Amino acid sequence: MSRRGSYTFSVAACAAAALLGFAAHAEAATCGNTASGFETWKREFADEARGRASAESLAALMATSYSTATISADRGQKSFKLNLDQFLAKRGGNTIVSRGRALKQQNAALFASIEQRYGVPAGPLLAIWGMETGFGAVRGNVNTLSAVATLAYDCRRSAFFTDQLNAALTLVDRGILTSATRGAAHGEVGHTQFLPKSVLNYGTGGSLDSIPNALNATANFLKAHGWVHGAGYQPGEPNFAAIQGWNAAGVYQKAIALLGSRIDSQ
C-alpha cells in the first residue's frame, strides 16, 4: 500500500470522525513486543472500546490470537534492491502480460464499465492484480483480524495498525470481514491486497475476494489519487503519480506502468 496501504492507505466524515475518536481511546491499551502481553492488551482495548464498538466486533477481536507468522514477516521485511529488469524477471513479468491480455479479453465488459466509471484502463489494474496476488492465486493464509490486532499491539507501529484495527472492526460490523477472513501477513486482503482502512476508504461494497469488487476498489483508489482519464501513466506522465500512491517502491511503480502499457497495447 506504502500502498493502498501496504502501508498507506475517504470514508464519510462521520465515519472518519468515529474512527478517530475510537483510536484516541484505544491507544491507551499497553503495547508489547512479545506474545506474553497480548491477551491483556486485548482486554484493555475491548474495555476502552466498549460502548463505541459493537458487541459483534469486540467478540471478533477477543477471538484473535497472537500471530507469529505476522511478526516473522514484519521483522523479515527487506527493501527492494533489484533493478527493473531483475524485478520483472523475479515477478514473472512476461506471464503477467500474457495472462493479463487474456483476462482483459475475457472480462471486456467489466473493464469497460470500470473505465467508464473511474477513467482507469484495464492495463494498470491487471498489472497490479498480477503483481499483488498472481491474479488471485496467492492471497495469503493468515487470519486477517489476528494479523492486524497483533500489529496494533506490537510497539513498532502501534498507532498505524490501531487505526487499521479500528477499520477492520467496522468492516466486521458491515459484514465485509469476519473472524474467518484470511489474507496476507500484515492484514492485506483480497485480489489486490488492501489493508482494512483502504477497504473502508476505497471499497465499493462487499468483499475484495470478489474480482469485480477488488478491481473497482483498485480503480477507485487510483482515481482518488489523481488519475485523469486519457492521460498517460508512464514515469513523467500525469497518472504516474497515482501509481506512486499505490506502492512506495520506485521499481514497483515502474513495473506497474510498464506491464500495464504492454497489456493495454494489445
Predicted regions and their residues:
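Sec/Tat signal peptide C-region and signal peptidase I cleavage site
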Residues: 22-28
